[in-house]
């Protein structure tokens, strides 16, 4: 009887230990998810940036990599990537380099087509069209004969100009990953087609699927908020072998040198 009682107590203690330990892991995951949200919120709280030239007067998070007197540079990037089943991956996007020292911006509208042979991905083509930003308008700096393409470039809007993450704190049940040695971190959330940002992306791009996307917040560098590293967001609609549809966006603050 004593033996049975001891065994019962040991098993009970073990179960309590596992339960508490498991709760501890859950709390750690929840805590890390909160940290990741806070880290991204430093950038995403700026969205929507209606006038990109406002970034000339906005300073990001600095560290020892910045030289004294360097006001830094904002790098803004948005890109839509579509690979229909069995076809090449086609990307359309733009990147701007906004120098706060000179208050000038240059960048490129970029078209790429990448073919997956099954063994290796090869660049079939990449076309870059130089642009500048003046009075919050994208202006091609070289002649473009294709009027449709020219209009697409002039009317291009970065996700950071229309996206809104005011409800980021309410996103729940994220798949969290954190590697302090790399360092890198991420959080992934399943969205619905009723999500505000999903509606905005669908409004601007012809997305050949009704499937609702997953949102991936992906960062490198110090999770506590160093200016080194990067923060990227990705809306993944389809991710299969030979078929991919995803949208990427980033706003980074770096030394201008």
Swiss-Prot record:
Topology within the bilayer: Single-pass membrane protein
InterPro entries for this protein: Csa, Csa_sf
Domain of life of the organism encoding this protein: Bacteria
Protein keywords: Cell membrane, Membrane, Transmembrane, Transmembrane helix
Annotated Gene Ontology cellular component terms: plasma membrane
Similarity section: Belongs to the staphylococcal tandem lipoprotein family.
Protein name: Uncharacterized protein SE_0114
Lineage: Bacteria, Bacillati, Bacillota, Bacilli, Bacillales
